[in-house]
Amino acid sequence: KIGDVDVVWNITPNDDNAYQNNLDQTLQNQESAAADDKIDIFLVEADYAFKYVDTDYTLPITDLGISEEDLSKQYQYTKDIVTDSNGTLKGVSWQGCPGVLFYNRDAAKEVLGTDDPAEVQKYVSDWDTFNETAKKMKDAGYQMTSSANDTYRVYSNNVTSKWVQDGKINIDDNIMKWVDDSKELVDAGETGTHDLWSDDWSKGFYPEGKVFCYFGPAWLVNFSMAADTEGSIGYNGGWGAAEGPQGFYWGGTWICAANGTDNKGLIKDIILKMTTDDDIMKDIVVDDDDFVNNNKVMNGLAD
């Protein structure tokens, strides 16, 4: 309960697109649903957020009484992702997901002579330098990354043109660079072609997997790289972090208000508390090792 309001959770797994399928059906039935059965609030992820925010199923954040000033400490990219084609903000997140290059400290010391982040960054400062370092890693018995798929999101986050221009498919130069660089690395045996999340891809979470680096945000190393499994690199604090060749983000979860809700005031309060309250934001960082969508809090903790 929140006050005198009963909170009813609808939890659907992501497997086989079940979450989106269920959400689609429920939103389509929103208008005819009984008041207590209507969706008030729902979550979307970065990969499919625009599908929902660019429809009338989501309310503009301003309709809830939330102002631009309320969200002034949030990172702009988190707003861009949930802004519709008319320039209207349709969602808010408590989370930021900036990505870094996680490197195997032992491999760095063995091959590069140091595991200091500032020094390691010199070996991965741009893609040409990264690819040269891959040769050194191969000579020492390591793959630079587990898979060519590890770097795709970094390249694709740094495109300067759209996929479709004037009704024609367009391949950005940075995507073509990923294709060329990946083929060179794969042909040289300096990376693999495993699917992300596969068992083969995950072997590098352990020393015997002989993988130098992965790309990801805080949640990857905290929750997805076997950090709680004895014998893994993460279990022993064996991953370091460097900026890498290019900045990028991966993931994130946004709160959207459903059109038709009769609880706008409560949704406003939830969003403001969850995404703008400095004390709550700091607690999330300290308690969960997460990166929050509040530049004041993050800069303060960094200092």
Predicted feature residues:
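Glycine-centered hinge/linker elements that transmit conformational signals in sensory
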Residues: 129-137, 166-199, 238
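Hinge/lid segment of periplasmic solute-binding proteins
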Residues: 20, 31, 35, 42-100, ...
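Extracytoplasmic/periplasmic substrate-recognition and gating elements
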Residues: 28, 229-300
